[in-house]
């Protein structure tokens, strides 16, 4: 048995659940792949905040706190979504859908991780970072999961704000404040989330429809969805270029090249739908992960090298 995207892959034998399966179930609840992507954005934000001179211990402590916060939020999300996870093929093998972990135990686990993350960040970084993490968990679980997700096709637009917070937490851990580069990084991820998520939802439209989740591809035509994907992709790239005001030439060059590539894929998807051709939205979903990773890795290297900024702002 192995873990993939918060799922348990493999069969749990009948009868009592083995200890190993239970442990894998708890790990799966935290959605490790999602956490991995969130943490990829935290380190570059911290390096940019102090142009590469950040204390490695502070980075480690912030990552631990961020990991605990994301794991807690994801677990509580799984608890709230246990009913619809059973109805979707993409999620039917998650631990709660298969009863590998009791729902009450998962709730306690998620709450414990969330509380621990708050006090960890408070103790090792500062109060602002701790409060940002706590607010993110509350927003993701109470606003996105319990309210927006099942009620509006714009759920991922507003709910995606939670996924933007690691850059704010990372920045505030270093500076104790929130400044404009942190807000621009927030916008990069905020605008990136809809095309990333809607591309996946296009592939699993029937799943969301069966679960009663009004994702945009469920309630709108493919042409409308891909047009929205294109708009948000342009906004994403524009935000990455705006961040170049605070970086050196390396980040700016990578942002231009990667942005051109990301836009080309979004335009290709939109053009294919307009022509009535079969399209592969999952390709855009997967490559959007690579795009975000490349841009933020370039930011990390640019900041670590303390390259001279292109503009004085």
From Swiss-Prot:
A Pfam match: UbiA
Entry's EC annotation: 2.5.1.141
Location(s) in or outside the cell: Cell membrane
Keyword DNA damage appears in the UniProt entry: no
CDD domains per record: PT_UbiA_Cox10
Reaction(s) catalysed by this chain's protein: heme b + (2E,6E)-farnesyl diphosphate + H2O = Fe(II)-heme o + diphosphate
Membrane-topology annotation of the record: Multi-pass membrane protein
Pathway recorded for this protein: Porphyrin-containing compound metabolism; heme O biosynthesis; heme O from protoheme: step 1/1
Cell membrane as UniProt keyword: yes
A GO CC annotation given for this chain: plasma membrane
Entry's transmembrane regions: 34-54, 56-76, 105-125, 128-148, 152-172, 173-193, 243-263, 291-311
One of the record's GO molecular function terms: protoheme IX farnesyltransferase activity
GO biological process, alphabetically ordered: heme O biosynthetic process
Keyword terms of this UniProt record: Cell membrane, Heme biosynthesis, Membrane, Transferase, Transmembrane, Transmembrane helix
Record family assignment: Belongs to the UbiA prenyltransferase family. Protoheme IX farnesyltransferase subfamily.
UniProt cross-references to NCBIfam families, sorted A to Z: cyoE_ctaB, PRK04375.1-2
Note: Carbon 2 of the heme B porphyrin ring is defined according to the Fischer nomenclature.
Function of the molecule: Converts heme B (protoheme IX) to heme O by substitution of the vinyl group on carbon 2 of heme B porphyrin ring with a hydroxyethyl farnesyl side group.
HAMAP family according to UniProt: CyoE_CtaB
Protein name: Protoheme IX farnesyltransferase
Organism, scientific name: Mycolicibacterium vanbaalenii (strain DSM 7251 / JCM 13017 / BCRC 16820 / KCTC 9966 / NRRL B-24157 / PYR-1) (Mycobacterium vanbaalenii)
Lineage: Bacteria, Bacillati, Actinomycetota, Actinomycetes, Mycobacteriales
């Amino acid at each position: 048995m192995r873990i993939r995207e918060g799922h348990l892959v493999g069969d749990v034998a009948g009868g009592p659940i083995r200890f190993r399966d239970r442990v894998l179930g708890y790990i799966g609840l935290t959605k490790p792949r999602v956490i991995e992507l969130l943490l990829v954005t935290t380190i570059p934000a911290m390096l940019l905040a102090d142009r590469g001179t950040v204390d490695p211990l502070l980075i480690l402590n912030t990552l631990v706190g961020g990991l605990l916060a994301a794991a807690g939020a994801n677990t509580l999300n799984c608890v709230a979504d246990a009913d619809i996870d059973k109805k979707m093929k993409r999620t039917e093998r998650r631990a709660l859908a298969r009863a590998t972990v009791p729902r009450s135990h998962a709730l306690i686990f998620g709450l414990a991780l969330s509380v621990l993350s708050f006090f960890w960040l408070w103790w090792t970084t500062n109060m602002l970072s701790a409060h940002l993490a706590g607010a993110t968990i509350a927003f993701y679980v109470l606003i996105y999961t319990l309210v927006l997700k099942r009620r509006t096709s714009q759920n991922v637009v507003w709910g995606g704000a939670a996924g933007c917070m690691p850059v704010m937490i990372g920045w505030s851990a270093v500076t104790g404040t929130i400044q404009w580069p942190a807000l621009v990084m927030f916008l990069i991820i905020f605008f990136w989330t809809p095309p990333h998520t809607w591309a996946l939802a296009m592939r699993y439209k029937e799943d969301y429809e069966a679960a009663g989740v009004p994702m945009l591809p469920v309630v709108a035509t493919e042409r409308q969805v891909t047009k929205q994907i294109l708009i948000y992709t342009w906004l994403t790239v524009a935000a990455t270029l705006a961040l170049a005001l605070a970086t050196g030439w390396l980040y700016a060059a990578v942002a231009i090249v990667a942005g051109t590539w990301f836009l080309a894929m979004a335009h290709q998807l939109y053009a294919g739908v307009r022509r009535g051709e079969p399209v592969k939205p999952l390709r855009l979903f997967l490559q959007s992960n690579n795009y975000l990773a490349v841009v933020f890795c370039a930011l990390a290297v640019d900041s670590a090298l303390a390259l001279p900024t292109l503009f004085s702002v």
